[in-house]
């Protein structure tokens, strides 16, 4: 018999909606290969929430959202059932946080995540806000602080979607000294830069990215480098073991670049990317930065298309380790959340 894992979902936008679709389509695989069955006992969106101890019907949840209705309209629904209420009152094994990112206060996700961990729930996040603003305190409430008896906290979806940035650095390179990490961790700017390389202006490339659904109506966090900076902050805390706030290092975006800049780099045998970088210094800490950077054309991150993100770790004994991921929608991020759910469920 598969082990039943009760999950509570905060947020039911594209990411968690696709997670539900994956849980439905992969149910037999999850049971047969991993011995796991996931039961959605609570969910909330902007309308309120719904809960059922026996589990909500996934088909009904998906159909409700596809019909543009809120989950509070369900028979088990209530407009007062928000994320904080769910973690305080609902019996669940895992809290799955995918509400919109708030990089000012981290709320409401931060408080809900903290409460869930304090109550003994495992946590899986796609919302990077709580981690970027409060990683050290959340780590101490979870196994990420070193105490494996505490609830697990997983967040691989927060740093490059399906790209295994955290797992590669934290798990697969265990026992090494990471001399440096380089990453292209923002898909919007990667697409814009590769489009500008073909001769289009920044404004034209941005509009194209928006038309394709790759850029927000207000792209400020992406194009000014702050989304990438928040991801680097998470890497610094979780992989490099360096307590870091996003305001601790220099961040430069791409809005000043022109097509001529991109094409001149290509003519010089280079490509410009928005590079997240952490370099170990003589004191053993890491100098962090986010900035457009010209890389040699044979560099792994310079070879990527406009649809790809990637990370490269340089280590003392394992040499260079790199990974890339091509993503054209929210499904890979949802797949990363499934990876984390399997991890905490086993």
Can you say where each PLM-predicted feature lies in the sequence?
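General beta-strand structural signal in soluble alpha/beta enzymes
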Residues: 94-97, 124-126, 153-157, 180-183, ...
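ATP-dependent carboxylate/acyl-activation modules
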Residues: 299-346
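Rossmann-fold NAD(P)-binding glycine/threonine-rich loop
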Residues: 100-119, 128-155, 169
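Rossmann-like NAD(P)H-binding beta-loop-alpha module
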Residues: 142-150, 154-215, 226
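Conserved active-site and cofactor/substrate-binding residues in soluble primary-metabolism enzymes
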Residues: 10, 14, 18, 38, ...
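N-terminal glycine-/serine-/threonine-rich beta1-alpha1-beta2 phosphate-ribose binding loop
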Residues: 1-118
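Substrate-binding/catalytic subdomain of NAD(P)-dependent oxidoreductase enzymes
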Residues: 195-196, 206-303, 308-310
């Amino acid at each position: 018999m598969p082990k039943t894992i009760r999950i509570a979902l905060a947020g039911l936008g594209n990411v968690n909606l696709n997670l539900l679709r994956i849980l439905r389509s992969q149910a037999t695989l999850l049971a047969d290969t991993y011995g796991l069955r996931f039961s959605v006992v609570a969910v909330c969106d902007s309308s309120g929430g719904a809960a059922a101890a026996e589990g909500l019907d996934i088909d009904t949840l998906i159909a409700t959202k596809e019909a543009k209705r809120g989950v509070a309209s369900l028979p088990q629904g209530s407009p007062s059932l928000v994320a904080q209420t769910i973690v305080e009152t609902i019996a669940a094994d895992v809290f799955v946080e995918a509400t919109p990112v708030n990089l000012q206060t981290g709320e409401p996700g931060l408080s809900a995540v903290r409460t869930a961990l304090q109550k003994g729930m495992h946590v899986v996040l796609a919302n990077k806000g709580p981690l970027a603003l409060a990683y050290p305190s959340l780590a101490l409430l979870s196994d990420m602080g070193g105490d494996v008896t505490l609830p697990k906290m997983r967040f691989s979806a927060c740093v490059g979607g399906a790209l295994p940035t955290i797992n590669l650095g934290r798990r697969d390179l265990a026992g090494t000294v990471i001399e440096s990490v380089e990453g292209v961790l923002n898909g919007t700017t990667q697409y814009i830069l590769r489009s500008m390389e073909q001769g289009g202006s920044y404004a034209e490339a941005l509009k194209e990215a928006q038309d394709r659904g790759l850029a927000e109506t207000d792209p400020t966090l992406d194009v000014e480098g702050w989304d990438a900076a928040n991801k680097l902050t998470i890497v610094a805390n979780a992989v490099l073991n360096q307590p870091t706030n996003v305001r601790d290092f220099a961040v430069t975006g791409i809005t000043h670049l022109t097509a001529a800049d991109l094409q001149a780099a290509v003519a010089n045998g280079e490509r410009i990317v928005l590079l997240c970088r952490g370099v170990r210094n003589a004191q053993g800490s890491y100098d962090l930065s986010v900035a457009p950077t010209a890389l040699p054309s044979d560099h792994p991150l310079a070879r990527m298309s406009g649809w790809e993100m990637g990370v490269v770790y340089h280590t003392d004994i394992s040499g260079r380790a790199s990974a890339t991921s091509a993503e054209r929608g929210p499904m890979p991020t949802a797949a990363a959340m499934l990876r984390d759910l399997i991890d905490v469920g086993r």
